[in-house]
């Protein structure tokens, strides 16, 4: 091309671009011109406060259980049981403002641990510096290194844990003082065989940098966890034999060692350990003088995975403890002592126990919530003796109940109960020890809800994709719903193991309905509350069972005249992003559009602990990994796909999105991408997401 022709081409290019600028700028406000925008703007702010809930806060018993105080409507009130009168005490302190989104204030960053730990007697401080454990006086003086071998070249570290332990085992500490402050236990990690992942950070700055993290992906070598105990006075280090002298191998219990603490008397170091497959879990005690271990409780679930961190609660003697287990196929409660002796089976239910509410040793009673209402979502308060006898349900099974420990009177004669369902707003009552209602304390005010014309959420029952069981979902309607019209449907999804799409908690409709959509959420066979045996349906099949059940939920609505089955979208973040992409790709007959944010796209790409718990390793479950691989279904793409990822996501790496994008490009598919520069594990902006759905499910004829 001659110089003249180049100049002419350049002038034409500039002219063409300048012509496009005004149109492009105007297009930035296109959501404001879309159907439903004004209705959404008008209603979304109103919906949030449309119901004055009939709930009480901060219940506190007074006068040996004769009265109690509570907070409601920014005031403190006192209720007298004998007179059944409520009197105003004064103004309540406003609730503290949250310090921000994400992790609780003061907690380490995602996947990390606290970098220091002060001894119980406040005299000493342990801290991690340059991959080694150090000790000093509490004021920082007289510091010295307990370990010196930790270094970046050898990829070893002390007093810190590998990222995957923090993320998947909730291990936010790596140093543990004994109760008498005489010893400190700590982690040693060897990451020399665990592959590194290079994450590029600061991509919006002049120079970017690389964050290098040992990140073992499914089937890859894991970091090796060891534990040591340092005796302050003796200056002696003892290695804890976390694997009973066995080598670090997949089958060995002790492949993972976590949830570390000292026994209340300080005589033993306690921790949980599992094999790599995570179908065996042992609650273990180590002798701090010798490092030898003994098993207190062993839990096994050969068909799939064992719960890795069962809730436990010590009794007053600090020797006996309440333990929960899924060994029967449903979570139940047991009483053990630290010798490992089973003292009592406290519950034997063919349904799930949810959580322990209160233990009253003097009265010999335990209160807990269980899922034995009219359906598994309706929590009920139970009371049982600490010998396992006289188990009684205290609440009405027609409702879902909430009772906190503070709501039960000191003498156990009464409790404050809040009840609700998906379509009955919460109300609060005073109940006696026999389950009889003593007084109505509060009920929800639905005046504004009704004035706005809001619609109650509908509970849906449908068959799982394989027809094996009933599942539930919820359907949200716009305030101006007209059953004679057809509406596009959005599915809000997460769908990961233990997630619930349906709920018996009262909720106002999803504000996205005001754009002119129906919005639904559906359970899967892996949802919470169905029991361990039911959840096993997803084992080795992530990305198949849950997605097929989402499609089954959508198809259960096809016979409703007001549902436009050809205009169904699905959205979610993280596992929900994965579910969104897979549903669109696996079930093009059910879904027409998907917004997939921060999505795993292949289980080959995710970490060992989470992935292998449900999928085992790809070397021994190739069919399962391939069936859950989004790239396998690229040719199925018929609808519209929006992909979002954060460039600094250290949980679901950008590699996931990149591999999906590459596969789509190679297949010549049309799709959209939104990127969060320097953003971590995050979601797509709601306004951009709704813009995408309106364009593809409403305006695209």
Language-model-derived ranges and their functions:
Residues 196, 257, 266, 396, ...:
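Serine-hydrolase catalytic core recognition
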Residues 81-84, 138-141, 232-235, 288-291, ...:
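Short loop/turn segments that connect beta-strands within beta-propeller blades
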Residues 55-60, 65-66, 71-76, 86-107, ...:
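Non-catalytic accessory segments flanking enzyme active sites
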Residues 73-74, 288-289, 328, 336, ...:
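Alpha/beta-hydrolase-fold serine-hydrolase catalytic core, especially in secreted/extracellular enzymes
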């Amino acid at each position: 091309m001659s110089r003249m022709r180049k100049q002419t081409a350049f002038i034409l290019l500039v002219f063409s671009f300048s012509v496009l600028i005004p149109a492009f700028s105007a297009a930035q406000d296109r959501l404001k011109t879309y159907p439903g925008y004004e209705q959404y703007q008008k209603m979304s702010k109103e919906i949030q406060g449309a119901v004055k809930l009939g709930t009480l806060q901060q219940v506190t018993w007074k006068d040996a259980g004769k009265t109690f105080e509570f907070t409601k409507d920014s005031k403190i009130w006192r209720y007298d049981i004998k007179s059944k009168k409520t009197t105003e005490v004064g103004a309540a302190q406003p609730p503290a403002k949250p310090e921000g989104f994400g992790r609780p204030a003061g907690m380490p960053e995602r996947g990390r641990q606290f970098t220091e730990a002060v001894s119980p007697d406040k005299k000493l401080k342990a801290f991690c510096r340059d991959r080694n454990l150090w000790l000093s006086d509490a004021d920082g003086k007289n510091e010295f290194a307990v370990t010196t071998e930790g270094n970046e070249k050898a990829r070893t570290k002390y007093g810190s844990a590998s990222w995957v332990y923090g993320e998947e085992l909730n291990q936010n500490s790596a140093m543990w003082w004994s109760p008498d402050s005489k010893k400190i236990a700590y982690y040693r990690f060897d990451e020399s065989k665990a592959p590194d992942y290079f994450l590029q950070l600061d991509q919006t700055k002049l120079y970017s940098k690389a964050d290098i993290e040992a990140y073992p992906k499914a089937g890859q070598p894991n970091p090796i966890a060891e534990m040591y105990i340092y005796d302050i006075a003796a200056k002696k280090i003892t290695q804890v034999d976390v694997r009973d002298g066995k080598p670090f191998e997949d089958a060995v219990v002790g492949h993972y060692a976590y949830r570390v603490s000292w026994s209340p008397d300080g005589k033993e170091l306690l921790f949980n350990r599992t094999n790599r497959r995570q179908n065996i879990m042992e609650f273990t005690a180590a002798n701090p003088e010798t490092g030898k271990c003994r098993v207190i409780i062993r839990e096994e679930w050969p068909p799939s995975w064992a719960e890795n961190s069962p809730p436990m609660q010590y009794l007053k003697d600090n020797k006996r403890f309440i333990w929960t287990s899924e060994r029967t196929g449903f979570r139940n409660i047991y009483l053990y002592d630290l010798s490992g002796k089973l003292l009592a089976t406290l519950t034997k239910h063919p349904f799930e126990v949810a959580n322990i509410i209160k233990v009253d040793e003097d009265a010999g009673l335990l209160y807990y919530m269980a899922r034995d209402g009219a359906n598994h979502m309706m929590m009920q308060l139970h009371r049982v003796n600490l010998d396992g006898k006289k188990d009684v349900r205290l609440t009405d099974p027609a409702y879902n109940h909430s009772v906190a420990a503070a709501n039960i009177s000191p003498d156990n004669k009464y409790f404050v109960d809040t009840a609700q369902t998906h379509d009955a707003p919460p109300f609060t009552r005073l109940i006696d020890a026999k389950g009889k209602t003593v007084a109505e304390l509060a009920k929800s005010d639905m005046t504004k809800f009704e004035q706005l014309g809001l619609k109650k959420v509908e509970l849906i029952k449908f068959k799982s994709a394989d027809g094996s069981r009933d599942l539930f979902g919820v359907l949200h309607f716009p305030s101006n719903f007209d059953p004679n019209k057809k509406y596009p449907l959005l599915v809000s999804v997460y769908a990961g193991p233990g997630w619930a799409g349906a709920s018996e908690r009262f909720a106002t409709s999803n504000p996205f309905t005001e754009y002119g959509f129906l919005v639904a959420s559906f359970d899967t066979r892996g949802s919470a509350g169905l029991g361990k045996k039911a959840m096993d349906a997803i084992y080795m099949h992530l990305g198949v069972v849950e997605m097929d059940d989402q499609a089954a939920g959508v198809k259960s609505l096809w016979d409703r005249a007001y549902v436009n089955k050809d205009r169904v979208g699905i959205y979610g973040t993280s596992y929900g992003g994965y579910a969104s992409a897979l549903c669109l790709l696996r079930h093009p007959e059910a879904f027409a559009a998907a917004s997939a944010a921060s999505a795993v796209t292949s289980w080959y790409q995710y970490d060992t602990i989470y992935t292998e718990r449900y999928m085992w390793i790809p070397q021994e479950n190739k069919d399962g990994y391939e069936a859950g691989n989004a790239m396998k279904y690229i040719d199925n793409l018929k609808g519209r796909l929006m992909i979002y990822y954060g460039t600094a996501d250290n949980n679901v790496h950008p590699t996931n999105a990149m591999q999906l994008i590459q596969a789509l490009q190679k297949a010549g598919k049309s799709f959209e991408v939104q990127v969060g520069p320097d953003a971590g594990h995050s979601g797509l902006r709601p306004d951009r997401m709704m813009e995408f759905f309106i364009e593809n499910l409403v305006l695209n004829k």
